[in-house]
UniProtKB/Swiss-Prot annotation:
Pathway: Cofactor biosynthesis; molybdopterin biosynthesis. Disulfide bonds: none annotated. Its EC number is 2.8.1.12. Keywords: Molybdenum cofactor biosynthesis, Transferase. Heterotetramer of 2 MoaD subunits and 2 MoaE subunits. Also stable as homodimer. The enzyme changes between these two forms during catalysis. It catalyses: 2 [molybdopterin-synthase sulfur-carrier protein]-C-terminal-Gly-aminoethanethioate + cyclic pyranopterin phosphate + H2O = molybdopterin + 2 [molybdopterin-synthase sulfur-carrier protein]-C-terminal Gly-Gly + 2 H(+). InterPro entries: MoaE_sf (IPR036563), Mopterin_biosynth_MoaE (IPR003448). It comes from the Bacteria. This is Molybdopterin synthase catalytic subunit 1. Belongs to the MoaE family. The gene is moaE1. GO terms for molecular function: molybdopterin synthase activity. Substrate binds at residues 43-45, 109-110, 125, 132-134.
Length: 147
C-alpha cells in the first residue's frame, strides 16, 4: 500500500507521495448502476510554456487539500443523480510520464460522467492548495501562486 499523506473517507480521496493507482480510483467509482465511467490521468510532460521540463515537485498542505477535495467531490456528485467521483493526487518529486492526478467519475449515463470528470479537474486546478515546482535544464521555479 502506498504511503498515504492524507485521505478522506468515502468518497475516495487520497493524497500520497507514492505512485497512483488507476485501479483503485476505478474501483471506487464502479458499480452495477454506473453505465458510464471516465478516468482522467494527468501526467508529467516534458515541456511547458515553450521550455523543457525535466521533473516536477508537488508540495501540499494535506488537511486543507483533503477538505477542499472532499468539497469538490461533493459538488461534482451533486450535479446529477447517481454521479460518483474519486480523486488521487501525488506529492513530492515526479518524473516525466508519472501520473500526478487520477480522477474517476461515473454515472448512470456517459454525459454526466464526462461532465463530472471535467468539473472535478477544473475545480481542483482552481481551488486545491497543491503547489508545483517545475525543473528544467536552466533551473527551477514555482508555477502559479504559492503562499
Amino acid at each position: 500500500m502506498a504511503n498515504v499523506v492524507a485521505e478522506g473517507a468515502y468518497p475516495y480521496c487520497r493524497l500520497t507521495d507514492q505512485p497512483l493507482s488507476v485501479d483503485e480510483v476505478l474501483a471506487a467509482v464502479s458499480g452495477p448502476e454506473q453505465g458510464g465511467i471516465v478516468i482522467f490521468v494527468g501526467n508529467v510532460r516534458d515541456h511547458n510554456a515553450g521550455h523543457d521540463v525535466t521533473r516536477l515537485f508537488y508540495e501540499a498542505y494535506p488537511p486543507m487539500v483533503i477538505r477542499t477535495l472532499m468539497s469538490i467531490i461533493g459538488r461534482c456528485e451533486d450535479k446529477a443523480e447517481g454521479v460518483r467521483v474519486a480523486v488521487a493526487h501525488r506529492t513530492g518529486e515526479l518524473q516525466i510520464g508519472d501520473a500526478a492526478v487520477v480522477i474517476g467519475a461515473s454515472a448512470p449515463h456517459r454525459a454526466e460522467a464526462f461532465d463530472a470528470a471535467r468539473m472535478c479537474i477544473e475545480l481542483l486546478k482552481q481551488e486545491v492548495p497543491i503547489w508545483k515546482k517545475e525543473f528544467s535544464s536552466t533551473g527551477a521555479e514555482w508555477v502559479g501562486d504559492r503562499p
